[in-house]
Amino acid sequence: MNILLTGGAGYIGSHTFIALREAGFEPVILDNFANSHPVVLERLARITGQPVTLERGDVLDTPWLEAVLRHHQPVGVVHFAGDKAVGESVANPLKYFHHNIGGAVSLLRAMAAVHADGSAPQQPTLVFSSSATVYGDPTTVPILEDFPRSHTSPYGHSKLVIEDMLSALRQTGAVSPASPAWRIGVLRYFNPAGAHESGLIGEDPADIPNNLMPYVTQVAVGQRPHVNVFGSDYPTPDGTGVRDFIHVQDLAAGHVAALRTLLDHNKSFTVNLGTGRGVSVLEVLRAVERTSGRTVPFKFAPRRAGDVAQCYADASLAKHLLGWEALRSLEEMCADAWRWQSANPNGYRG
């Protein structure tokens, strides 16, 4: 059974590719490599022992997407493609609205077209890569799926708008009168971290990392002088931001569980994917120091626009609906992230 992964060469997409292949699916990667590296494909082939099927192009190109869908006839689509940096979205909101919202509209139109004309035999089935940023700045934690939604950045706003589009599809049942009802799984990620245990693939930002873990490991490996800790006066135990860090392989397993649930039970859902445990920035730094045996220098800096004090999940609904839960610890995330970074000091660039 083919599964199309938009943005499948990216950090989460590449790990999900492995999990899907191990689960017996045939994942097909769709990517334009704007935020990823072609060498990932070679690494995936080494890990899985099989060649990787790639469709190179842009998710904004609707006619091309239609042709890809007709050719591969996937039983499901996992939509990762998009821009993902909170800070950048504040500085350049139109980029995020165009790429993220426009890309989602393009994909939905393409899926609707191939199902409406009978080119695809299955119900349109989509797993969407959403984000905990749709909860804005929550007043209490842990966060449940029925908490009020909001946003503190254009990135979060783009995810919220896409969720609303998908909700409308679920309520109306179709994009057009001729297309069948949709099966949609919305996965609200918390903070992905770690890497594949092989050390062959991991998180490799094209520029200065926006996520904490790759920044810390780049400092530990000597690529950067120190970690900027944005905010030391949050109302948290040590004054730094608290997040729910989830191992990327646990997150990948969540996508497999989501697809199986949609295909087997024909029921749409929205769930959190997190560990349910909040960890502060300083706690992550200390964990990486223990794992790597290196000192990680840091400096406090002003809070970043769009950041919130604390954000961690109640993931009990995912366990109930999908039979999924996060299994790996913070120490395992740090160990795998360090293995990747130390083996690949310059990431995929050699």
Task: Go through each PLM region and give its residues.
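N-terminal Rossmann-like NAD(P)+-binding domain of SDR-like oxidoreductases, especially those catalyzing
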Residues: 1-195
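Residues at structural and domain junctions
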Residues: 27-30, 75, 82, 93, ...
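Glycine-rich loops and low-complexity Gly/Arg-rich segments
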Residues: 52-56, 78-80, 102-104, 150-154, ...
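Pocket-edge positions in alpha/beta enzyme catalytic cores
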Residues: 57, 69, 96, 146, ...
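Short-chain dehydrogenase/reductase
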Residues: 97, 101, 152-160, 202, ...
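Glycine-rich, flexible loop segments associated with nucleotide phosphate handling
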Residues: 120-126, 179-184, 206-212, 240-245, ...
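Catalytic core of nucleotidyl cyclases, primarily class III adenylyl/guanylyl cyclases
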Residues: 198-200
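C-terminal substrate-binding subdomain of Rossmann-fold SDR/epimerase-dehydratase oxidoreductases
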Residues: 212-350
